[in-house]
Amino acid sequence: MSETTLKITTGPLPGSRKIYVEGSRPDVRVAMREIDLTPGSGEAPVRVYDCSGPYTDPSMQVDITKGVPRLREQWILERGDVEHYEGRAHKPEDDGLKPGETIGVPVFDRAGAGLRPLRAKPGKAPTQLAYARAGIITPEMEYVAIRENMKRAEMKAAVVRDGEDFGADIPDEVTPEFVRAEIARGRAVLPANVNHPEAEPMIIGRNFLTKINANIGNSAVASSVDEEVEKMVWATRWGADTVMDLSTGRHIHATREWIIRNSPVPIGTVPIYQALEKVDGKAEDLTWEIFRDTLIEQAEQGVDYFTIHAGVLLRYIPLTAKRTTGIVSRGGSIMAKWCLAHHKENFLYTHFEEICELLKAYDVGFSLGDGLRPGSIADANDAAQFGELETLGELTHKAWAHDCQVIIEGPGHVPMHKIKKNVEKQIELCGEAPFYTLGPLVTDIAPGYDHITSAIGAAMIGWFGTAMLCYVTPKEHLGLPDKQDVREGVVTYKLAAHAADLAKGHPGAQVRDNALSRARFEFRWKDQFNLSLDPEKALAFHDQHLPAEGAKLAHFCSMCGPKFCSMKISQEVRDFAAAEQGMAEMSEKFVNDGAEIYHTEPAQAQQAKPAAE
């Protein structure tokens, strides 16, 4: 595959430039985005969180065939607790191939890129949780602290924190020590597989900025490697903090390799999907050995977190029988079918301690899957959902005992009045491990608009304490999302996450809102566009009726025209009020000076005049 065959979107967003903030060592260079505003406006550039990696830096030459820079490689090796090894051989079944079939897509050249898998040395635990518990502040933790702060120290004086955080512990300033302490408590995770050195460190936790995840992936009937890599780049361009590859078709291994090697954000997967492909889609033929081999395969590639549906227990399955929509999780339904076919307990549950040891060797995080999440608002908060959540709490403590990082997945479809209870129960049962929810959708009547029905719930659950929101696209329940659906989903969820941060009173969250509001009131149209979550869409909507460049200077838009613009009228009222205030002040001075039309010149002034010649 070459850059000519794989079209990747590059270049900065409108009005923006990439900057880097250096930490305590030269190789800790934290990428951010600065939005420059109109010269002469008196406005400083607005600094915003950036997930786009080298793709928006014009000074970087990205070669997809070699992957993006390995930012963390030296940090990982210098700790001395991992070792290179040969790794498992790439097998035809990894890509869904039958014996004798050849792969039909390009394969990333790992050997040419100098890549060999890493794993823990015997007796070592190379996880961010283990380091945090030992009191070690890693370069990754320092990177995260700088990234979360941006210009917080300068901004906090200008913005009052007036939100409701429901018992969170959001600091005025994020320090590396605070990051370490939150990870050590299990309240935050820093997804960072030792085999994904390309990923820029980020953190997920309720005391940090609310994050979003974008799902991509092929299916048995649609998409290609090219499309999925571009979807990843596209998703991070618009603000995805992590990306999950949910591929279910052929060439899963090859597609994932291209994605990971070129991803600046953590990558998650659901390993049971690939394991199922290896047994021709027959859930009853799954075995622990096949699943374990799949975990190793993906950990060696560099997957940062796995969704593991270990909470779908045999005793919970009958609780779903009277549901409106049964079991809607793909992973949950696969494991439920296996349990019923064998009348045995879920092998992900019975082998959980072994999974912990395996994940610890690579610092792969757990995303404990909600296989029994409600798929309709009629099923929200039922016994099956909360029974599984209780088991996830049990498994969280087991994973922590192995120094594994954990996040907890949540619903789903939940009406607004039932959302808060989900967060409260998750915090109670799972020891404040970060919550990661799919929406939730607050109504079931809007196919084609489920990015909106879910963003309503996402904003609410984020406010209540969910740490990461999994996006929903307009194609949810209808089909595989394309590139534009990904953009729509990401931007919609950035909006929901930001709304949650505002409501929580997150320091500095309102700076961008205030800057855009001032630009709007002052008719600085380009600043409005550039400060928005989707500058290109904002510009396109404006230019639909007023495309001329001069319209970017006009004090009106096509909605109200020049005579009915409320902001223009408001400015005129303000100017009139200022003039009236000035007149009132002059009137008061006139009265205070004696209300005389003509004033007699003071005697001292007359004496000071020179005599006439």
From Swiss-Prot:
Assigned EC number: 4.1.99.17
Membrane-spanning residues: none
Broad class of enzyme this protein falls into: lyase
Biological process according to GO: thiamine biosynthetic process; thiamine diphosphate biosynthetic process
Required co-factors: [4Fe-4S] cluster
Catalytic activity: 5-amino-1-(5-phospho-beta-D-ribosyl)imidazole + S-adenosyl-L-methionine = 4-amino-2-methyl-5-(phosphooxymethyl)pyrimidine + CO + 5'-deoxyadenosine + formate + L-methionine + 3 H(+)
Gene Ontology CC: one annotated term: cytosol
Binding site for [4Fe-4S] cluster: C557, C560, C565
Cofactor comment text: Binds 1 [4Fe-4S] cluster per subunit. The cluster is coordinated with 3 cysteines and an exchangeable S-adenosyl-L-methionine.
Residues the record lists as binding Zn(2+): H413, H477
Keywords carried by this UniProt record: 4Fe-4S, Iron, Iron-sulfur, Lyase, Metal-binding, S-adenosyl-L-methionine, Thiamine biosynthesis, Zinc
GO MF entry, a single one: carbon-carbon lyase activity
Pfam families: ThiC-associated, ThiC_Rad_SAM
Pathway annotation: Cofactor biosynthesis; thiamine diphosphate biosynthesis
Chain's role: Catalyzes the synthesis of the hydroxymethylpyrimidine phosphate (HMP-P) moiety of thiamine from aminoimidazole ribotide (AIR) in a radical S-adenosyl-L-methionine (SAM)-dependent reaction.
PANTHER family: PHOSPHOMETHYLPYRIMIDINE SYNTHASE, CHLOROPLASTIC, THIAMINE BIOSYNTHESIS PROTEIN THIC
Protein name: Phosphomethylpyrimidine synthase
